[in-house]
């Protein structure tokens, strides 16, 4: 399940429900206050909407660049998988707003990302994913929730201070 997609009405006209579509756009975030608590809401803002055929060209792919805004959290899952949570602040081109995107690195990338510091520049390629989890409320009350995040496939670039560390070739992913 992907996050909500905001499609301008002019683009949505004459579209069939459940039709394969190809969307290019921005992955954005905003805070929504609910019951006195703030929740990070993520959505795709469509800028291009084309007919898709369900082929590999229609794959779920995202390239993000930004700055680490929280310390990375490295851990092992109950099944032994190495993961590292990252929160990446992505500035809009005009610098008037910043989107905060939760990301998850796996295995080798998780070990590498565990040493990153707040303020480090990163460029990643990955995919948008969702997961359902149980949120314990008061007493025995449990609520099912959905979390959206970027699953990192590769860390393309990492810059700490004046040192740049190129982990992969950008040309490989921007075909």
Task: Mark where each language-model region is.
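Single-stranded nucleic acid-binding surfaces, predominantly the OB-fold ssDNA-binding core
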Residues: 1-175
């Amino acid at each position: 399940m992907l996050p909500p997609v905001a499609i301008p009405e002019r683009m949505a006209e004459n579209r069939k429900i459940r039709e394969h579509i190809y969307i290019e756009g921005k992955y954005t975030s905003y805070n929504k206050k609910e019951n006195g608590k703030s929740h990070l809401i993520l959505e795709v803002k469509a800028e291009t909407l084309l007919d898709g055929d369900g082929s590999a060209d229609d794959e779920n792919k995202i390239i993000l660049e930004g700055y680490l805004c929280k310390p990375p959290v490295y851990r092992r899952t109950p099944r032994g998988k190495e993961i590292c949570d990252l929160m990446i602040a992505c500035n809009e081109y005009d610098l008037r707003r910043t989107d905060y995107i939760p990301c998850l690195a796996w295995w080798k990338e998780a070990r590498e990302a565990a040493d990153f510091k707040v303020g480090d520049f990163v460029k990643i390629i990955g995919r948008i994913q969702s997961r359902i989890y149980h949120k314990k409320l008061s007493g025995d009350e449990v609520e099912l929730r959905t979390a959206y995040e970027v699953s990192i496939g590769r860390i393309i670039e990492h810059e700490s201070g004046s040192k740049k560390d190129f982990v992969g070739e950008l040309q490989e992913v921007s075909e």
